[in-house]
Amino acid sequence: MHNNNVGDDGAKAVAEALKVNPVLTELSLHGNNIGDDGAKAIAEALKVNPVLTKLDLDYNNLGDAGKQAVRDAVKDRSGFVLYTSG
């Protein structure tokens, strides 16, 4: 889902889907104009989704609060790959 401009509302919808998704292991939301609100929604979803192992949030509009929320959500998940730069 690279560069689709989903924004915070789209990220919130993706987060709801992640909460009940038993198969998706990698997700790229690279360059989608996602801000802190969207990142926080994704972070909440990651807390209940043990299947996802890689998440690319590079080149969005994440502030420190959004980045930290996602990092905190996966901090105890060994091997989780997270990209939040750009």
Indicate residue ranges for each PLM-predicted region.
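Leucine-rich tandem repeat or coiled-coil scaffolds
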Residues: M1-G86
